[in-house]
Amino acid sequence: MIERYFVTEIGKIWSDENKYNTWAKVELLVCEGWAQIGLIPPTDIEKIKTNLTVNLPRMLELEAETKHDVVAFTRMLSETLGPEKKWI
């Protein structure tokens, strides 16, 4: 964003941190939907809810390595989970 047009509140909306936190919320909602129809066991969805964490520095590091934002994102989320990461 061009600095002279920067408004703090708008800048936060378009920040990488907000973008990846929103993506994580979507992932969690999808997992919750799958759990409701029985595709994800209740124990796994609870672990996902508890442990799903966005780590922006790690995300950017993985993105630099993979050259792909979605691959980096799913890897970053998976690092915060155990075997239940298969649902991400």
Curated annotation (Swiss-Prot):
Function: Catalyzes two reactions in de novo purine nucleotide biosynthesis. Catalyzes the breakdown of 5-aminoimidazole- (N-succinylocarboxamide) ribotide (SAICAR or 2-[5-amino-1-(5-phospho-beta-D-ribosyl)imidazole-4-carboxamido]succinate) to 5-aminoimidazole-4-carboxamide ribotide (AICAR or 5-amino-1-(5-phospho-beta-D-ribosyl)imidazole-4-carboxamide) and fumarate, and of adenylosuccinate (ADS or N(6)-(1,2-dicarboxyethyl)-AMP) to adenosine monophosphate (AMP) and fumarate.
Keywords: Lyase, Purine biosynthesis
E.C. number: 4.3.2.2
Protein name per Swiss-Prot or TrEMBL: Adenylosuccinate lyase
Pathway field: Purine metabolism; AMP biosynthesis via de novo pathway; AMP from IMP: step 2/2; Purine metabolism; IMP biosynthesis via de novo pathway; 5-amino-1-(5-phospho-D-ribosyl)imidazole-4-carboxamide from 5-amino-1-(5-phospho-D-ribosyl)imidazole-4-carboxylate: step 2/2
Positions with a binding annotation for N(6)-(1,2-dicarboxyethyl)-AMP: 4-5, 67-69
Lineage: Bacteria, Bacillati, Mycoplasmatota, Mollicutes, Entomoplasmatales
GO function term, MF aspect, one: (S)-2-(5-amino-1-(5-phospho-D-ribosyl)imidazole-4-carboxamido) succinate lyase (fumarate-forming) activity
Keyword Transit peptide carried by entry: no
Subunit structure: Homotetramer and homodimer. Residues from neighboring subunits contribute catalytic and substrate-binding residues to each active site.
GO terms under cellular component: cytosol
SUPFAM superfamilies associated with the record: L-aspartase-like (SSF48557)
Gene field: purB
Domain of life according to the entry: Bacteria
Catalytic activity: N(6)-(1,2-dicarboxyethyl)-AMP = fumarate + AMP; (2S)-2-[5-amino-1-(5-phospho-beta-D-ribosyl)imidazole-4-carboxamido]succinate = 5-amino-1-(5-phospho-beta-D-ribosyl)imidazole-4-carboxamide + fumarate
Protein's UniProt keywords contain Transport: no
GO biological process: 'de novo' AMP biosynthetic process; 'de novo' IMP biosynthetic process
